[in-house]
A protein has these predicted regions:
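N-terminal TM1-TM2 helical hairpin plus the immediately adjacent luminal interfacial "cap"
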Residues: 15-124
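C-terminal transmembrane module of polytopic alpha-helical membrane proteins
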Residues: 1-18
Length: 124
């Protein structure tokens, strides 16, 4: 059963459109962070401070001064989602509006728009 799911995911990553790849990458990062949170919290006896230190390192800081010390967060924050509803609605909206944008401007331009949107959204 899981073998066919992994085959479908592998197929979409190799031959799917850009929008599907972005959604799958976001979901993979969400699952990886969720597993990391579970493992770190379990190993540390319920203390998840190390997890929050890591997520603070990859999420967008609130002050511009702190952004100068972690400029990579302008790119990584767009892949970090904290809750199930957060990622669900973000990916639904990305799928719906991304499909419309892909039809209008072409599939090749979806990733640059996502990338620049995340970058400038983080700046402003």
């Amino acid at each position: 059963m899981f073998d066919s799911v992994f085959k479908d995911i592998r197929y979409e990553l190799t031959r799917g459109n850009t929008l599907t790849k972005i959604i799958l990458i976001n979901c993979a990062v969400f699952i990886a962070l969720l597993l990391a949170k579970i493992i770190i919290t379990t190993v540390n006896g319920g203390d998840s401070n190390i997890y929050y230190l890591f997520t603070n390192w990859i999420t967008l800081p609130t002050s511009f001064g702190q952004l100068m010390y972690q400029p990579w967060s302008l790119f990584t924050y767009s892949f970090v989602h904290e809750g199930l509803l957060h990622i669900l609605f973000n990916m639904l909206l990305l799928y719906w509006f991304g499909a419309i944008a892909g039809d209008l401007i072409g599939d090749r331009r979806i990733f640059p728009i996502y990338f620049y949107g995340a970058f400038f959204g983080g700046l402003f």
